């Protein structure tokens, strides 16, 4: 989201294009590490949140599932392509990442099961953890995507975060 405003300037600035390609490629790599994560390290360095009850990996800083974390990379890549005409970012890794995005969105519609994502944290802040043994509040599967956390990193009480679902379409 932070570099998105620069996209309109990229056509005239080679260094800016290179920076945007790097950001898109980094976001692609992050999605491939874990599409449910919202914060990543530069490498496998671990995190202060390693004790969270979820599938943490050393490359992750935090694993709070938000729909927006998968929408912003798509928006950036799409508008970069529309502005510059460069398709180099749409390689096989990008394709794999988009398959992971699609799979994650389908899993979090929770039509067949709760999906693989759970999260709980030992904390005195209710907004930092999910209810129901890490699954979040129950939902009736209607086709919307469950977002366990809001873009502000606080837990959703009602999993169908409508603005984020609109962003996803």
Model segments located where?
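Acidic/His metal-coordination segments adjacent to aromatic residues that form catalytic metal sites
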Residues: 46-64, 126-160
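A conserved active-site cap/scaffold subdomain adjacent to cofactor or substrate pockets
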Residues: 158-169
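Detector for Asparagine
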Residues: 25, 38-41, 132, 140, ...
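Solvent-exposed, flexible loop/coil residues
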Residues: 13, 93, 149, 153, ...
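Aromatic-rich carbohydrate-recognition surfaces in CAZymes
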Residues: 3-20, 24-123
């Amino acid at each position: 989201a932070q570099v998105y405003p620069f996209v309109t300037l990229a056509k005239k600035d080679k260094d800016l294009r290179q920076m945007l390609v790097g950001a898109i490629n980094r976001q692609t790599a992050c999605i491939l590490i874990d599409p449910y994560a919202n914060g990543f390290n530069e490498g496998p360095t671990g995190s202060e949140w390693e004790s969270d009850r979820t599938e943490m990996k050393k490359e992750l800083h935090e694993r709070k599932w938000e729909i927006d974390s998968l929408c912003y990379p798509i928006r950036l890549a799409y508008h970069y392509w529309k502005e510059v005409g460069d398709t180099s970012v749409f390689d096989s890794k990008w394709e794999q990442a988009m398959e992971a995005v699609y799979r994650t969105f389908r899993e979090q519609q929770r039509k067949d099961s709760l999906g693989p994502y759970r999260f709980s944290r030992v904390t005195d802040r209710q907004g930092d953890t999910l209810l129901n043994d890490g699954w979040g509040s129950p939902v009736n599967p209607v086709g919307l995507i469950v977002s366990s956390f809001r873009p502000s990193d606080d837990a959703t009480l009602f999993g169908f975060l409508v603005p984020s679902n609109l962003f996803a379409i």
